[in-house]
Amino acid sequence: MIKGLDSLSNEQKELLFRVNELHTKCVGSDYKDGMEIIETWVNENNTVCARLKNGNWYHYTQENTWF
């Protein structure tokens, strides 16, 4: 279960999973397990954020990018 997922709109959920899939495809095999989303929220700028199993968190943008 992903903490905070219920607070996202359907559009935000689609963005979350789409960008995470792209993000996961870009990392090496050793890192793929840590790319699982464990928590999500929307920040004050209305940007979807995701905390991953590896402890890192990212902003996921409408342009299908992350930072």
Indicate where each model-derived feature is located.
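A short, surface-exposed beta-strand/turn
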Residues: N56-F67
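Short linear proline/tyrosine/threonine-rich motifs used for host-factor recruitment
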Residues: A50-L52
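N-terminal non-globular leader segments, chiefly Sec-dependent signal peptides
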Residues: M1-T47
